[in-house]
């Protein structure tokens, strides 16, 4: 089935190496490489442009087992089918498995046995600064975005919306891990992936406000 979006011009990135190409999973999406100064590398998103020049944006976050090749909303979550022909811009960040889309406080070296040579991930900065900058280049709104996700992405969507109310107006979570302060959650995260030890400082006491923040 042909869609309006697959015939629309490819978008761009003003950085030296950024680009968009036709998405090989969903023809109505583009696969865009955006340079992230915070992460010092190109990072990928799926992007579906609005069909009639709307500047509104919705962002959907993947779960803890997110892969580096695609965001599972685009195929398994039905985003390609659901948003086909719709007058809204859709951004699906690619990657970020077990990251909670947060800014890591520690480099992997010394805190992760399975990823000892990787640098600190800066997902929150990528989503709220680098992607927003890219959206502004495309003449999209940088306010009143909608953000949602499932599992890990659901809790992360709520946390990002709360901290960046200048960007996100609405947030939704499907089967999300919406708090990290419950007893046993830190241990559960560590058994999921040892990179969680690189994310945050120890949770601290219950009266420490930072205990309740992603």
Predicted segment positions?
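Non-catalytic cap/lid and distal C-terminal segments of serine-dependent acyl enzymes
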Residues: 1-214
